[in-house]
Amino acid sequence: DRPMVAKRSLQPGDAVIVLGGPAMLIGLGGGAASSVASGDASEDLDFASVQRDNPEMERRAQEVIDRCVALADANPIQSIHDVGAGGLSNAIPELLHDSGVGGVIDLGKVPKDDPSLSPMQLWCNESQERYVLGIPQARVDEFAALCERERCVFAVVGVATAEERLVVGYGLLAPPPANAGGGREGVALAGHSTPPHPSPAHAGEGVELAIDLPMDVLFGKPPKMHRDSAHPAPPQWPEADTDALELRDAGLRVLAHPSVAAKSFLITIGDRSVGGLTARDQMVGPWQLPVADCAITLSGFDGVTGEVMSIGERTPLALLDAAASARMAVGEAITNLIAAPVASRDRIKLSANWMAAAGHPGEDARLFDAVKAVGMELCPALELSIPVGKDSLSMQAQYQADGVAQKSVSPVSLVVSAFAPVVDVRARLTPLLRRDVESELWLIGLGAGRQRMGGSTLAQCFPDANDGAALPAFGGDAPDLDDPQRLRALFELVRDAREDGLLLAYHDRSDGGVFAALCEMAFASHLGLDIRLDGWGDGRTGDPLRVLFNEELGAVVQVPVEDRAAFADLVARHGLIECAQRIARPTTAPVIRVSDEDETLAEWRWEDLFDAWWSVTHAMQRLRDNPACADSERESARRFDAPGLQPKLTFDASEDIAAPYLSTGARPKVAILREQGVNSQIETAVAFDLAGFDAFDVHMSDLVAGRFDLADFNGFVACGGFSYGDVLGAGRGWATSILERNALRDMFAAFFARQDAFSLGICNGCQMMAQLRGIIPGAEHWPTFQRNASEQYEARLALLEVGESPSLFLRGMAGSRIPVA
């Protein structure tokens, strides 16, 4: 909503509020410490710089902000700023300066969990999940009521002043009323009805000043930093001798390299479906393998538009050429993003995360080269902007090893995130190959035949073949984006071919080269491949290892054989004919074969290549989780003939079964019940609204305060989310808040005893209801939730079969097999 985007100016007398978690001795110097080499600072600062998170508090703060935004023009928030690097010392002055006002800040009002914090620690710590915001004095009580409902800590810590001066200390604001209550949250909520004001002359009994200075001192024009750095001598890495390598061994080693291998062990431990708007996560196809190029979310529950996000990084190349590494990072972000239907290139926005070992000899010069290459050359050529980003300039660590001082230095690193609106999320392309159409795979290589191997995964897999040293054969020319116009042409080619119905699948070429891209498509689809190296339109051939394992930018697309001519014509019209090569054909045999003309160069069993690709995930899961579960998953995943997820419905999903019951216009009322930290109430409410219910947002604090009564509803749904901790058994905290309050216990018991009402528990809400079985008729034998066999949180699609059940939710669905997250 555009009116909610622009900040309004604070007026003198407006309250300055801290919303969110309490201050603690964490992240002290976190943002600053990210620009201090590890080992340079004191041990105490190193420990204090460690960041810790509290997602439940973040959820509570976000709910307060959402409730304010929902008021539209009546939103009480005039301006808001997140608390990041520098803590309150940065956030509050910026909030005031943006409005051209000063402020008086009372550190004694800042919520804190550590009473020993000094003024500097209280002002500068970077405890997370906090915001600072400005609100008119007349609306502080209204804002306090929202915070109380969401059980979110907040405090009025100051007041805006007409004089552009920052005054910080203790005893500067009027004290809260004597009956304000105690406790951390009580203090945070106390005193909001008394307009804070500066003590006279900022001095007097009980007043302690820590800061008193003009805002210009903070926001004037400081002198620009000047740094001198010289380019170091080019690194003398040995260059890979591909003539000495055996193709079959190379394929196995590259797929087992951590940069290429499957990352399922990192993905299944995180919830990817919360919010109900995920259209594309990492896992692709019936076998749910992590090969997606980008993430796509829906922009709402009632349409097909959405947003796409992708990432690009090629940090190892910076050891050879920092500018090339940066250009390749931008290019990879775009080639990943192309899988989604973005209407035009100018809708793409980038975020740049720069990292470097600033001050280390030569690294400042490399950083300058990389920033110049992207910011002043490549992005202007692509007509792309980088409106946001961040940096960490301390990418080096000092330590002692056997009494000898050592230093570890990371190369200049650029991680690019690309974002764009999506016109129709259903038109996305994935690496999943279509099996029902005779097709071929085309490589569009933006190197236009160049096969630079410097810094490649293949080079990292082999020592110098000439002397057998441990040093990888990492050298040679690094791949690069030589012509930005080719990247623009690839974007437009894929967009036009998609609209013409010429593409069935898409995957970018990156780490591991086209061989890795092709294998990932084969793994995701449980198909074999016949890879041919003689498919260039002009008859070009080359060194098989360089063709297969160079990591120049590019993409592989699946094209129906019957559309070959139309696609080739489109390639030519976009000026990419010298970049295009027919490189493979899908097969149903469990074999991946590489040939040139009529000669077979290498052949692998599908399972052998899959085992190599899965090896990192398998090893990590065996170390972290239950080894037996890791072994079982590998055995299941590596079966070429595994059926995968095969959904089956025994009912018509388009039938509106509620229509006959709603013909009178009376919609049953359902309470969407949530507790602090719950995060799935919106999609739950939408689901019931679409099913014909009137959904009401009911917080547990509403039941405690008597604002709602379950007796007024036909049903309630206890929603999911990390209330009282995102751990097994967290629902016990929610249940205890009911069982230990007689009024709530009686309310829930009476509701469960009704014959004309229903209840549903989801995720944490299900755990909560399991703890209420003592007041639920017929629930005496309900099972308890136990730790799973893998001993790890598992976020996977499970194929569930619906049995015969008296549940009104499952009536008429028996025999259906449905993937459930």
Q: What residues fall within each predicted segment?
A:
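A glycine-rich phosphate/pyrophosphate-binding beta-strand-loop-alpha-helix module
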Residues: 1, 28, 42-47, 319-396
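Short cationic amphipathic helices and targeting signals
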Residues: 125-136, 551-560
